[in-house]
UniProtKB/Swiss-Prot annotation:
Cofactor: Fe(2+)
Reaction(s) this enzyme catalyzes, per UniProt: 1,2-bis(4-hydroxy-3-methoxyphenyl)ethylene + O2 = 2 vanillin
EC top class, as a word: oxidoreductase
Activity regulation info: Activity is high with beta-5 type stilbene and minimal with beta-1 type stilbene. A 4-hydroxyl group and trans-stilbene structure is essential for the binding of substrates to the enzyme.
Keyword Metal-binding: yes
Annotated organism of origin: Sphingomonas paucimobilis
GO biological process: carotene catabolic process; lignin catabolic process
Gene symbol of the encoding locus: lsdB
Keywords: Dioxygenase, Iron, Lignin degradation, Metal-binding, Oxidoreductase
Protein name per Swiss-Prot or TrEMBL: Lignostilbene-alpha,beta-dioxygenase isozyme III
Subunit note: Homodimer of two beta subunits.
Length: 490
């Protein structure tokens, strides 16, 4: 008989859902724009069995993939587990066999050496398939419409890297699926690789390189000619794992680096350029990056100190929720300079913001519009807890980098918002002309809605709201795919 622990990561809004099913034609308030024809896929961690350890991380849950199919002004819903090797063997056993988050030393002997991945962090459509991703394991292939799992892939044996980051980018010019993996040759190693997969799903090249130290390399930036990697000291070691401590811990004595890796075949580690930040800070996600002459601009929400209370300071310093608040910054480095120092660090917004997004047609290019989640602590909140991180993201924000204008929508006192996603109005619409879609979780009624807003007029509120008769667990990331990218029979 299953019984989940009475812990903060397994109760309340974070209580496991474990529901697979289909709902045809969701109830809608307002209107869903009829021209929206495609899919919004997103994923959340959702353990199918109680964890082996009561204090297990939220991020260790099995990947549950949600599909919202937009067509003819309607939205259909489907949800399935990503059937990883871990999921299958535990399903057969009827219990959890894999142990603590990213700690193989805590696994049951029967599964030692198996792939531990959960495919719970991001999902993207490419080459007619759905790539389900978790940064500590290979890419899991699923059908984008049925959500049936095909299995892990190493791209016909060509990809050497053992891991596959969840924050891949699709180059809007080439159509290549651009990604990387860290700890590429084994847990805690400093080996990484950057690689590109063509629009047909074939691996084009893989560039191997070394990073200054092993850390959580969760996201990266892509420009026309470079892949950009920030090294932030959310870093572990084997002593921590042997002691049963959380995999990652924040080390304020380590510097922050920004690595610039040229894109293309034949690149080696000696071609990589590293720049040092002026101080140690925290940064995880990336809004965008682009080139301007010899300079590279890298836009990321930056906090003055560790933003993850569940990965505590390794020196014992207490978590500081104010210093953990991220604000969008622009890091600039100059490839024309002989200095290893950043050329400039500049704050771009006044909002506490995270989960940044752009119009995907402008990834790696100079851009004007950005969106993200905002925590506004001055607004009324009728609930005590928010996301696993503790952040209570109650606004969707829009930033116009050309004018400095900021626009936002507040979701009300009972709700928090999951990561937004931009959808262009038409394939050839101007940058930013389109819609923002996002899940809104009402923490009082315990239901989730999918809202659609005008991307450049957020303050006007949702155009349409699809009402789910269930709550979806707090998710991580998701993406839109136009119907033209889906395996739909003519």
């Amino acid at each position: 008989m299953a019984h989940f622990p009475d812990t903060s990561g397994m109760t309340g809004v974070l209580r496991p859902l474990r529901i697979e099913g289909d709902i045809l034609d969701l109830e809608v308030e307002g209107e869903i724009p009829a021209q929206l024809d495609g899919t919004f896929h997103r994923v959340h961690p959702d353990a199918q069995f109680p964890p082996r350890f009561e204090d297990d991380q939220f991020f260790n849950g099995d990947g549950m993939v949600s599909l919202f199919r937009f067509h003819d002004g309607k939205i259909d819903f489907r949800q399935r587990y990503a059937q990883t090797d871990k999921w299958k063997v535990e399903r057969k056993a009827g219990k959890s066999l894999f142990g603590a988050y990213r700690n193989p030393l805590t696994d049951d002997a029967s599964v030692q050496g198996m792939i531990r991945g959960t495919a719970n962090t991001n999902v993207m459509v490419h080459a007619g398939k759905l790539y389900a991703m978790k940064e500590d394991s290979p890419c899991l292939i699923m059908d984008p419409l049925t959500l049936e799992t095909e299995g892990y892939t190493n791209f016909d044996g060509k990809l050497k890297n053992q891991t596959f980051s969840a924050h891949a980018k699709i180059d809007p010019v080439t159509g290549n699926f651009c990604n990387f993996g860290y700890a590429a040759t084994g847990l805690l190693t400093t080996d990484c690789s950057y690689f590109e997969i063509d629009p047909a799903g074939n691996l084009l090249f893989e560039t191997e390189f070394q990073v200054p130290y092993y850390c959580m390399m969760h996201d990266y930036g892509l420009t026309e000619h470079y892949a950009i990697f920030h090294i932030v000291p959310c870093s572990p070691n084997w002593d921590r794992l042997k002691a049963g401590l959380p995999h990652f811990g924040f080390d304020t004595t380590l510097p922050v680096w920004l690595g610039v890796v040229p894109r293309g075949p034949g690149v080696t580690n000696k071609d990589v350029r590293w720049f040092k930040a002026p101080k140690t800070i925290f940064a995880s996600h990336v809004m965008n990056a682009f080139e301007e002459g010899s300079k590279i601009h890298f836009d990321t929400p930056q906090a003055e100190n560790n933003a993850f209370p569940f990965f505590p300071d390794i020196h014992g310093a207490p978590f500081d929720p104010v210093a953990a608040r991220p604000y969008l910054h622009r890091w600039t480095v100059d490839l024309g300079s002989n200095s290893e120092d950043f050329a400039e660090v500049r704050q771009l917004t006044s909002w506490i913001d995270e989960f940044p997004r752009v119009d995907a047609r402008y990834v790696g290019q100079p851009y004007r519009h950005g969106w993200g989640l905002v925590m506004d602590p001055e607004m009324e909140m009728e609930f005590a807890r928010g996301r696993a991180s503790g952040f209570k993201m109650n606004r969707i924000g829009h930033w116009d980098h050309a004018t400095g204008k900021e626009d936002s929508w507040w979701c009300g006192p009972q709700s928090i918002i999951q990561e937004p996603c931009f959808v262009p109005r038409m394939a050839d619409s101007a940058e930013g002309d389109g819609y923002i879609i996002a899940l809104v979780d009402n923490l009082i009624t315990n239901y989730s809605d999918l809202v659609v807003l005008d991307a450049l007029n957020l303050k006007d509120g949702p155009i349409g709201r699809a009402k789910l008769p269930i709550r979806l667990r707090s998710g991580l990331h998701g993406n839109w795919a136009d119907a033209s990218k889906l395996p739909i029979a003519a």
